[in-house]
Amino acid sequence: MELSVVGGEPLLAVAMQQLLDLDLPDELERQLNPPTRAYVRDRRAMANTPMDVKELRASGALVLAVDMPGVAPADVRVEVEDGNVLAISGERRRPAGDGDDGGEGVKYLRMERRMGKFMRRFPLPESADLDGVRAEYKDGVLTVTVDKKPPPEPKKPRVVEVKVAGAGEPKGKGK
């Protein structure tokens, strides 16, 4: 039972195809208010920054490896914020003269590599040595190493000297 036919195809099939042709995420994003758009943008920036986290068995140090192909080391920032949160942020930029500016530059036919700001936050354990955080950038991978604090030495019992009342005081001098 078909309701009507458009160009030889059932109306329902035409409507379904039109829905599939829409780029819904972009259409929905355009209708969001600016603070919500900023939130969506930041969540995408976090989701599009892949990171591996591993713990070294010998030392207990944490090693975070973040893929950052095409990012200049000067555009990367690593900081410890809000106590024990490691924040990695930066920006991936298009090469100079490679913009789609309508001039003599470049006209992109397909853009699949994401450009723009990126950010990742990682909560560090209480045992992390925040003064010993190191970062190294090589071959498009940022490696951040966070050493583990040595365990605190067990408290030794403190010996308290016991004084004997009245011993060593001359007799006859009372209070």
From Swiss-Prot:
Region called Disordered, residue ranges: 145-175
Subunit-level organization: May form oligomeric structures.
Cysteines engaged in disulfide bonds, as pairs: none
Record protein name field: 19.0 kDa class II heat shock protein
Similarity annotation: Belongs to the small heat shock protein (HSP20) family.
Chief site of localization: cytoplasm
Pfam families: HSP20
Stretches assigned to the sHSP domain: 42-165
Record's subcellular location: Cytoplasm
One GO cellular component term: cytoplasm
UniProt xrefs under PANTHER family: HEAT-SHOCK PROTEIN 20 FAMILY MEMBER
PROSITE patterns: SHSP
InterPro entries for this protein: A-crystallin/Hsp20_dom, HSP20-like_chaperone, Small_HSP
One GO biological process term: response to hydrogen peroxide
Keyword Cytoplasm assigned: yes
GO molecular function: unfolded protein binding
Keywords from the named record: Cytoplasm, Stress response
Biased composition, class Basic and acidic residues, residue ranges: 146-161
Gene expressing this chain: HSP19.0
Protein's organism: Oryza sativa subsp. japonica (Rice)
Domain of life: Eukaryota
